Amino acid sequence: RPKVLAEAQSAARSNDDEKLRRYVFEAMRFDPLAPGLPRVALEDVILARGTWHETSIKAGAQVLAAFASAMMDPRRVANPTTFDPNRPASDYMHFGFGLHECFGRHINRATLHMMLKPILKRENIRRAPGPNGRLRKNGPFAERLVVEFD
């Protein structure tokens, strides 16, 4: 998305940290660090009772609170496939939600965009050629991506 990259670079170069933060969080919505958080059901429960996808979960079963899919669910997020850095903060569930929200959320909100800012200020930023320019992951976690700039 060259247009989105150019807009993020413009925010970085003009020191518009709030705008840059919004671009970073919106980009992370499309490819979050982790797909969700594992949890253990404390009691038997039936989800979606009375619907065609009713599911029974037994106490002690492992479940995944899949916030990655929730952030792309049109019942939860308006126009989920559209890149929109002006979304309400409630659309972002990268760090969980509610009582089980990661306490690192606030640190990340304050620092993630600042770590990317010096890179985004560079001219002609691009992926390195060949395999180094492809995002390498270890499971859902980004491991390496080499970029070049002038």
Feature map (PLM): residue ranges:
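Cytochrome P450
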Residues: R1-D150
